[in-house]
Swiss-Prot record:
The keyword Transport applies. It is a peripheral membrane protein. Residues 1-342 form the SMP-LTD domain. This is Mitochondrial distribution and morphology protein 12. Residues 343-354 have a biased composition (Acidic residues). InterPro entries: Mdm12 (IPR027532), MMM1_dom (IPR019411), SMP_LBD (IPR031468). Transmembrane segments: none annotated. The SMP-LTD domain is a barrel-like domain that can bind various types of glycerophospholipids in its interior and mediate their transfer between two adjacent bilayers.
Amino acid sequence: MSFDINWDKLVSDDSISNSIKDFLNDQFNEISLPSFVDTLSVTGFSLGSIPPNITIRHIGNPFDEFYKRNVPEEEAKKGQLPVSPELSGSDSDSSEEEPAINNLDSTNQQDFTPLLPEVDSLRRQNQESKHFNNFNMNNVGLGHMDLDTPTNFFNPHAYRLHSNSVGRNESVKKNDNDIQFILEIDYKGDVALEIVVNLLVNYPSAHFITLPIKLKITDLVIHSLAAVAYLENSVFISFLCDLNDADSDYFTSASMHRRSDAHSRGSHIPPSSGGNITDYVPSNNKERIDVIRSVKIDTEIGEMENNVLRNVGKVEKFLVEQLRNIIRDETAWPSWICLDFNDDDDDDDDDDDQPSTASTQHSSHTS
């Protein structure tokens, strides 16, 4: 089953792009910068004109974790829908900072206890998806699966939550209208992210040269399985695992060899007009999910010496690694993004005819 997305409406809403830009800028500002970078800021973001291809693989009930909320007392008094990092077992709390788009770390990765799903029926149900990764789930405590599909993701009761949270726990009441879609997202679009950094040359002395450079990250490639759940007038989004392309096997030795070669040489294109364009694909690993499969970076620089160009390459690699880490840590299971469409003032009848704006909820994520 497939459906069309009115991508133009998303692109035309500048507030969405600005929210994503501000969120990424906040995340990058929390990163410890290497010695060859002074400052880093996200200056622009565009969703582009090409929408993702989305295929519905399963429709069912939302994961139980989406109903488990830890309620700080101050948020409970305000009547807000709470999101707290305590479910992840973390003592840190950065909920005072409110970037526009944030994740909820649903639980400690080691707190998952797998329940045996009805494997045979699920295998028959999803036999059309034979190109899914035969991935290793040990990094989230689910054990290795020898099936062609991540069948546990299609079982709404496949995980039992053991919460070691501190504070008052609340469970959102289940409703007959609650629904969850397991989606295959295949995106090869023209999303663009612009970043400005100050490149430092620390020879012959520290901060000997400070060179501002502008980097544009484009050609984002994502092919993943994601859960999108709707409950209590909120939308939960979480990436579950990366998927194979239909014509290749991500974990075969030949495929890994090609990816390793591409990663080592970076698919460089000769610089033109002081710029540098580099393709970046993920390094050879068998992690459950990267989300971002590959990106391209266009760097605007002047005519510089080779040692400066080498530092530019380090900056590019650093940015790609950090961007991939941010997206994975903030949106990949057991973390998720929650878009809250509940109005703050339910008794405000004057705004009934106005479209509801999505607000997002914040919690810290401990890697």
